[in-house]
UniProtKB/Swiss-Prot annotation:
Top-level division of the source organism's lineage: Bacteria
UniProt cofactor(s): Mg(2+)
Record protein name field: Orotate phosphoribosyltransferase
MF terms in GO: magnesium ion binding; orotate phosphoribosyltransferase activity
Iron in keyword set: no
Xref: InterPro entries: OPRT, Or_phspho_trans_dom, PRibTrfase_dom, PRTase-like
One of the GO BP terms on file: pyrimidine nucleobase biosynthetic process
Organism, scientific name: Streptococcus pyogenes serotype M3 (strain ATCC BAA-595 / MGAS315)
PROSITE patterns: PUR_PYR_PR_TRANSFER
Residues annotated for orotate binding in this entry: S126
Self-association state and partner proteins as the record states: Homodimer.
Length: 209
């Protein structure tokens, strides 16, 4: 079993991911979605957490061997990033969504040196907007952002477009395609549900029609 399928299995088992193609969720954006993900839940399950953190470390070593600092996005990327940095004996920092409105007004907490090679940790990629904002903030502070590594992606076309336009490499430990395949195999969804889930990936607006 691949790492992607192992993580997909764990996310379903611990109910970090819910699939309701016949009774969709409403995202904050207003989009009706057949999937809801809360990867913060993974922190409460040592087996799942260990699988994810080891997966992060292996992936970073394989794709970004020159990394010098790990950064987590606030707030979801902070705990994972801190664990990864500890496992890799690397410095850690975290990136706020916007600068503080008091004190030193920092957006990056921790010490990042000019030119330091950074990998940013995120838990979930939908359109990628927030983590790309974090990457831009890190670059403005002088970091050399090598890429983003995340637990899971919905594989939305908008995300691919956003990362391409930003020139930022994205790698995820698991993904939507892998998850719905595992969900079908393990009986979480029906054939009709799988069909709807596949339609959502291609068209987030008209998938129910």
């Amino acid at each position: 079993m691949t790492l992607a399928s192992q993580i997909a299995t764990q996310l379903l088992d611990i109910k970090a991911v819910y699939l309701k193609p016949e009774d969709p969720f409403t995202w904050a954006s207003g989009i009706k979605s057949p999937i809801y993900t809360d990867n913060r839940v993974t922190l409460s399950y040592p087996k799942t957490r260990d699988l994810i953190e080891n997966g992060f470390v292996e992936t970073i070593r394989a794709h970004f061997p020159e990394v010098e600092v790990i950064a987590g996005t606030a707030t979801a990327g902070i705990p994972h990033g801190a664990i990864i940095a500890d496992k890799m004996t690397l410095p850690f920092a975290y990136i706020r969504s916007k600068p503080k409105d008091h004190g030193a007004g920092n957006q990056i907490e921790g010490r990042v040196l000019k030119g330091q090679k950074m990998v940013i940790i995120e838990d979930l990629i939908s359109t990628g907007g927030s983590v790309l904002d974090a990457a831009a903030a890190a670059s403005r502070e002088g970091a050399d952002v090598l890429g983003v590594v995340a637990i899971f992606t919905y594989e939305l076309p908008k995300a691919s477009q956003n990362f391409k336009e930003a020139g930022i490499k994205l790698i995820t430990l698991s993904n939507y395609t892998e998850l719905i395949a595992v969900a079908k195999l393990q009986g979480y969804i029906t054939n009709d549900g799988l069909h709807l889930l596949k339609k959502f990936k291609e068209d987030q607006v008209n998938w129910q029609q």
